[in-house]
Amino acid sequence: ALFDGKLDKKENLSVFTIPQLSIQSSGNPARTLKADARISLSDDHTHDTVNAAGDSLGLKEAAAALEGFAPKSDAAALMRQMTPTGQLENFRFALLGSPKGTPDVSFRDIPDRDPEIPGMPGVRHLNGSIAANPETGMVKAWGENGEASFPGIFPDPRVPFRKLSGTAFWSVSPKLELNFRDIELHNQDINIKGDADWIDTGGSGTIRVTATAANSLVKSAYKYVPTLAGAGIIDWLHQALLGGTAQNAAVEWYGPIDRFPYNGRDAKSGLFLVTGNFRNSSLDFLPSDKRTETGARVIGGDWPIVSRVNGQFLFEADRMVIAGDTGISDQVPLHGVIAEIPHMGG
């Protein structure tokens, strides 16, 4: 560490001013923090402050520093859970009050955050900015050729992306609330845009999602259905949808998560609705349990596959309807084919 500082003592307050502070880590590769810092320490530690601004700081090193300076703070606990990597650039940092309190932090330009802890959402290869304090915060992010992690949310917890962008906001008072705006996700399966909100209303909370998708692969739809939709829906989609392209898909979902899928006595408590069109699809309407000698599932084992299908699909609560305007089965032209499952949960 290299620095040339100045110490001022005023009544019960000591002020350290350190211009051009330089600290090099002992890791491999070594990383260097360069910053301007100002530290104020009161005799009773009730008015301690730390202010720093610099051009580059490793997230891993920042977590270690926070752990050493304020190990009991909420920010240090969050860093321990997230195990972040990557670099902060053009950052500003402020810690106000006693080291035992919660810091007020403002960072900019976060190139990386790796998801390695089971159960903790995360992202690889992310760029963006973050500003936060104990009550509210905002993250604006974008990335290319990375991976997002949503443990427990989707059948496959890891979702790769070619491009990802959006803004997230949060507040903790009067209730924890998360808001996601202008989210865009593009990968080899899906192209989706949308907004989402989550509020801590007890239990699993209340959610609101509105989204649209264009030119997405029908056979990959099951990957993006929330696991709380039930194994019946996800398994059927995985086995029955064999190909084609989904177009003009729209998603509308709101209500208490614990009451999903909002049928029966809970019908008025929320809404889950997915609609759209599909083209040139292949459907195995009645997926078979029959297996080949190698253990592979026999496609079309109980009912002939319907191919070259154009039509519409609808998911409402736990009801599913697939309406094929045209299609072919065993070389027989079909018109007005409808597959409906009133209760996908069984």
Question: For each predicted feature, which ranges?
Answer:
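Membrane-proximal interfacial segments on either side of biological membranes
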Residues: 8-14, 31-181, 190-323, 327-329, ...
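Hydrophobic/aromatic interaction determinants used to assemble and anchor large protein complexes
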Residues: 21, 27-29
